[in-house]
């Protein structure tokens, strides 16, 4: 079946689906308030059935049942909640109310035999809405009241925002309880209301974070369970432990609850946003016990609910916690299951876990290359794959989303990726015998396959720089591969490009890898202009296809190679405390190694990057004149002022970035003032001789846009050739298509002028005065 909502139908169609109210003789228009026509189409027979004025609907997962709410038609269809059997076409009216009633979180159980919903049937304008939770069982004609104000725990109310979920065995219903709404005194006049922000030094969340999370705070609810058999209500989440975790089927006796509040203040500089106190709650009686205090990372529940488990980032160790015995087991202590290549001033993250085997018997965990099987109780383990010897990583492909466990009684499918060659493929593997067979591999990037539910047919894509990721169909052996799409046939009409790996050494002796993109008609005897574009480490994306499009922040490789440019994307390895110097030590010797190959025009080299890439470019041009032109997007140029800034998209303080994450200073300005000074391009602006195009938008929520202003006005003060692009209202990148096109046109004209000797555009010659903004773009070339 297919659902076709009438919500997006044009106005002139409204009359066709409107119904005359017999008493008022007026048309009831489809709207968000009145509801929209819901069209159900049988995909086999194409027969359609239309239900008018539907405001909510949901399907059952394993039966042909549809539940919906409607505002009804007077004297014809009563407003309320209905269940429709799509097989027999029968309809059951399970709840009645007036057409102004509002319904929330309509939820059918998997079998379709149980339904739950929250309703607000109060027609008054009370600020504290009297939400009620109802449930229906197929044995009953009408839905029954489960929870309302009278039987809610003291100080709580039914939430209209908390999700409703039946346990897999349908004996329990999980829902949300909320604290009373905070409402303003309606008797106050506007001139009596004080609008002041009070920022407090020791409150858990910075005021700006509270503002960004205000809507979530208003919708906050605490997980609660209702047991149908004994009509018992047990609250799971609470103000002390507001967050809850259940197993996927929610059948088990225990839930995890946790609180990050004790660590929210320090997370602003540590970056440990998930650090929490973890407790266990028995969902049958509400009894709880503290499991792990100060758990550095989030925990999960094993599929069968026997273990809490996770990765302790501080100890770099995977652990399990037996819920019944309270036994804590360090599974990977002393082993390298942490990110071996991490160069942040922080504890390294993990490579993740593949999942669990049946009955929580074992857990499969990834290291850099391989899959290991661990006994969750004892920690005994064995390596299943042999990837480290070949520098090839193996990762599990889940083909059936309905299966909770990794099957060990049949072969499974793995993705493979070779770190050295960047080749990928598919691998058939037997967990029991630890033996496998490479089914497919090559110099491509293969997607994660999707399997048909009722057959062994797979759908996947493969791509490379030269090859578009068309859709392919195959069986599980990949011996009957068929390409079923041809999305980009016009590519053959263009000078595209080729991608290859390049190797060199940094100034401090580290072997490095990068991507080298050449025009399709490359001639090694010619000299080509070079564009350097980088961020951190990108060489693993060697075989990614890059279709021409006006990107929001980066050069488009296919576009520039077709115009005769060579592109170089070097990987950067960082040393804590010296991010700018690290970029110099990696990028510049890569550029000189390319020049030595003889096909690069060393007098026409440009560099481009955005955000962290924009910062590194701003730093590089203070240290070298090797670049004839540079585009620096959303750059930080003053690490001291940026350290005290706000990431306005989230409200977070920027301190954690410098102390523990990407900016890699490794401490505060008062601990390492020299590091902040040395890594800030603003203090060496006078040494820049490279013309600069800067893009920084006034609503950037990642990097404060005054950083771009600091950069530009300093260059302007010194008379350095520079231009600043600010797309009004745009955030970290221009997202509107017209702005993206404009940015790419200006960047192309900028690089063509400096690196290819093209004519200068008007906007670079005289700018675009404010009086001409949006009228004259200045693209015209001066001849």
What does each model-identified segment do?
Residues 73, 101, 122-124, 521, ...:
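Short strand->helix junction
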Residues 161, 351, 360, 366-369, ...:
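Active-site lining segments that contact anionic ligands and/or coordinate catalytic metals
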Residues 53, 96, 187-188, 236-239, ...:
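Composition- and surface-driven signal marking solvent-exposed, interaction-prone regions
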Residues 334-340, 344, 478, 486-604, ...:
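Cap/lid segment of the alpha/beta-hydrolase catalytic domain
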Residues 547-783:
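Active-site-proximal cap/loop segments of hydrolase catalytic domains
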Residues 1-457, 463-469, 473-474, 761, ...:
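Beta-propeller folds
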Residues 3, 67, 224, 234, ...:
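Hydrophobic/aromatic beta-strand patches that form the interior of the parallel beta-sheet core
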Residues 260, 417, 463, 533-537, ...:
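Glycine-rich His-Gly loop
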């Amino acid at each position: 079946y297919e659902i076709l909502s009438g919500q997006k139908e044009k106005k002139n169609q409204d009359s066709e689906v409107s119904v005359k109210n017999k008493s008022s003789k007026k048309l009831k228009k489809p709207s968000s308030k009145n509801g929209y026509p819901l069209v159900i189409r049988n995909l086999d027979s194409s027969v359609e059935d239309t239900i008018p004025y539907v405001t909510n609907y949901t399907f059952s997962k394993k039966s042909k049942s549809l539940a919906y709410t409607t505002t009804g038609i007077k004297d014809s269809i009563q407003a309320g909640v209905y269940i429709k059997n799509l097989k027999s076409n029968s309809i059951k009216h399970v709840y009645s109310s007036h057409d102004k009633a509002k319904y929330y979180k309509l939820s059918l159980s998997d079998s379709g035999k149980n339904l739950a919903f929250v309703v607000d049937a109060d027609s008054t304008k009370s600020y504290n809405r009297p939400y009620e939770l109802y449930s229906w069982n197929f044995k009953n004609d009408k839905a029954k009241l489960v929870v309302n104000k009278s039987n809610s725990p003291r100080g709580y109310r039914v939430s209209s925002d908390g999700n409703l979920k039946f346990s897999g065995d349908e004996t329990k219903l999980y829902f949300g309880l909320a604290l009373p709404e905070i409402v303003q005194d309606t008797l106050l006049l506007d001139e009596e209301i004080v609008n002041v922000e009070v920022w407090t030094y020791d409150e858990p969340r910075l005021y700006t974070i509270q503002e960004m999370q205000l809507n979530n705070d208003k919708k906050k609810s605490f997980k609660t369970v209702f047991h149908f058999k004994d009509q018992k209500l047990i609250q799971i989440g609470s103000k002390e432990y507001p967050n809850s975790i259940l197993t996927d089927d929610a059948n088990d006796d225990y839930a995890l609850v946790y609180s990050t509040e004790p660590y929210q203040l320090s997370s602003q500089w540590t970056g440990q946003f998930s650090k929490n106190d973890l407790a266990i709650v028995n969902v049958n009686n509400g009894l709880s016990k503290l499991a792990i205090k100060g758990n550095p990372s989030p925990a999960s529940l094993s599929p069968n609910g026997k273990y809490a488990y996770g990765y302790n980032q501080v100890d770099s160790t995977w652990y399990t916690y037996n819920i019944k015995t309270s036994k804590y087991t360090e599974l990977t202590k002393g082993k390298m299951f942490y990110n071996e290549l991490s160069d942040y001033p922080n504890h390294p993250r993990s490579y993740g876990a593949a999942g669990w085997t049946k009955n929580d018997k074992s857990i499969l965990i990834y290291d850099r290359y391989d899959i290991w099987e661990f006994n969750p109780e004892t920690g005994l383990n064995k390596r299943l794959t042999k990837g480290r010897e070949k520098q090839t990583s193996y990762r599990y492909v889940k083909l059936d989303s309905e299966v909770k466990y990794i099957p060990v009684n049949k072969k499974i499918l793995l993705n493979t990726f070779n770190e050295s060659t960047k080749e990928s493929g598919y691998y058939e593997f037997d967990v029991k015998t630890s033996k496998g067979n490479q089914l497919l591999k090559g110099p491509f990037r293969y997607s994660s396959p999707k399997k048909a539910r009722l057959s062994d047919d797979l759908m996947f894509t493969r791509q490379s720089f030269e090859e578009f990721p068309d859709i392919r169909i195959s069986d599980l052996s990949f011996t009957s591969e068929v390409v079923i799409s041809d999305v980009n046939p016009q590519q053959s009409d263009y000078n595209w490009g080729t991608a290859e790996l390049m190797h060199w050494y940094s100034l401090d002796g580290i072997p490095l890898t990068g991507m080298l993109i050449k025009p399709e008609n490359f001639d090694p005897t010619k000299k080509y202009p070079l564009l350097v574009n980088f961020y951190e480490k990108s060489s693993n994306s060697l075989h990614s296809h890059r279709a021409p499009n006006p990107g929001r922040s980066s050069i488009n490789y296919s576009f520039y190679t077709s115009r005769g440019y060579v592109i170089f994307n070097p990987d950067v390895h960082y040393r804590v405390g010296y991010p700018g110097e690290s970029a110099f030590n990696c990028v510049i010797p890569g550029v000189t190694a390319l020049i030595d190959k003889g096909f690069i025009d060393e007098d026409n080299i440009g560099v481009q990057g955005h955000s962290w890439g924009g910062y590194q470019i701003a730093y590089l041009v203070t240290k070298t004149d090797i670049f004839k032109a540079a585009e620096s997007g959303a750059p930080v140029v003053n690490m001291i002022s940026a350290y005290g800034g706000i990431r306005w998209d989230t409200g977070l303080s920027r301190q954690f970035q410098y102390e523990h994450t990407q900016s890699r200073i490794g401490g505060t300005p008062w601990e390492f003032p020299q590091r902040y000074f040395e890594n800030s391009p603003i203090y060496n602006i006078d040494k820049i001789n490279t013309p600069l195009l800067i893009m920084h938008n006034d609503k950037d929520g990642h990097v404060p846009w005054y950083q771009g202003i600091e950069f530009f006005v300093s260059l302007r003060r010194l008379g350095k050739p520079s231009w600043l692009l600010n797309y009004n209202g745009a955030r970290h990148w221009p997202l509107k298509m017209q702005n993206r096109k404009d940015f790419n046109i200006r960047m192309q004209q900028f690089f063509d002028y400096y690196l290819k000797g093209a004519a200068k555009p008007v906007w670079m010659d005289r700018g675009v005065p404010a009086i001409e903004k949006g009228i004259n773009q200045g693209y015209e070339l001066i001849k």
